[in-house]
Amino acid sequence: MTTIRQRIDTQHRDAIHDAQLNIYGNRLATCGSDRLVKIFEVRPNGQSYPLIELSGHNGPVWKVSWAHPKYGGLLASASYDKKVIIWQEVNGRWQKTYEWETHEASVTSVAFAPHQFGLMLASSSADGTIGILRFDAQTQQWQSSRIQNCHDQGVNSVSWAPGTADPAGKKRFVSAGNDKLVKIWLLNEELNEWTCEKAIHCHKDFVREAAWCPVTNKGQHSIVSCGLDGNLVLYRIADIETAEWKSKLLEQAPCALYHASFSPCGSFLSVSGDDNMITLWRENLQGQWIKIPRENKEREGMGQQR
């Protein structure tokens, strides 16, 4: 059974769309339909305190993402107003440090890459493209590019593959789209071009999110995806350079699923959907994902009524 340690009154004026802790778990960023991004300090005892309210978007803010702390205090936000904004903490004060408005429709998600890849982030958009922002340390400027025609009818999420200590390690990320596909993208370093390495069709409706597990297990990579069809799908690959991705249906929920997220250690998974409930999953020692029992059986009851 899981318990709620602390409720945080964010005082958002409308629906909250995302909440992300930084790597240390002592800062929480939230965003919502009120066009605001908020940052809170989270104490070890569970108490929280508001730090700053950031305004700069002209529409609902869908996603926020923290950069690795080696780059200082950096937070990115994605909004319906077609903008990606990067916020920076300077001498204890947060300010807008970069604004990117190249997407032609709502920016549906944003994600900073692992620090091993350098200071870079990816954004997805309803215009069907994926944006890449990379900070050039020599010029001290952000460099941008867009990958065209990534998903028909729009891209809903992006998530990076875990970083590696090997300098020759390849950069990859996964995307989910309204074309019912999950796609793996690979960077050709020589050409500086992103190409679709693999397109996987395991959903019957829009794929709302695909999340790449932030850690590998003996070289094995894992991805989960969820969609409006209620399917929660696990993808695994033993050797990402030579093997093929294998998929497994973890659950067919009686409702649409919108979000799936791994814990930082990669051993827990949270899933949420149309039933306003959060389901937690845990990977056992045999590598199997098991749903953690809960006292509230509403989802199971809904499944029986279907």
Swiss-Prot record:
Quaternary structure and partners: Probably part of the GATOR complex.
Name of protein: Protein SEC13 homolog
Lineage per the UniProt record: Eukaryota, Metazoa, Ecdysozoa, Nematoda, Chromadorea
Domain of life: Eukaryota
GO molecular function: structural molecule activity
Physiological role: Functions as a component of the nuclear pore complex (NPC) and the COPII coat. As a component of the GATOR complex may function in the amino acid-sensing branch of the TORC1 signaling pathway.
The family this protein is said to belong to: Belongs to the WD repeat SEC13 family.
Protein location: Cytoplasmic vesicle, COPII-coated vesicle membrane; Endoplasmic reticulum membrane; Nucleus, Nuclear pore complex; Lysosome membrane
WD repeats: from-to residues: 11-50, 56-97, 102-143, 150-195, 202-245, 252-291
Main location: membrane
Keywords annotated in UniProt: Cytoplasmic vesicle, Endoplasmic reticulum, ER-Golgi transport, Lysosome, Membrane, mRNA transport, Nuclear pore complex, Nucleus, Protein transport, Repeat, Translocation, Transport, WD repeat
A GO cellular component annotation in the UniProt record: nuclear pore outer ring
Gene name for this UniProt entry: npp-20
Biological process annotations from GO: COPII-coated vesicle budding; mRNA transport; positive regulation of division septum assembly; positive regulation of TOR signaling; protein exit from endoplasmic reticulum; protein import into nucleus
Gene3D superfamilies in UniProt: YVTN repeat-like/Quinoprotein amine dehydrogenase
Mode of membrane association: Peripheral membrane protein
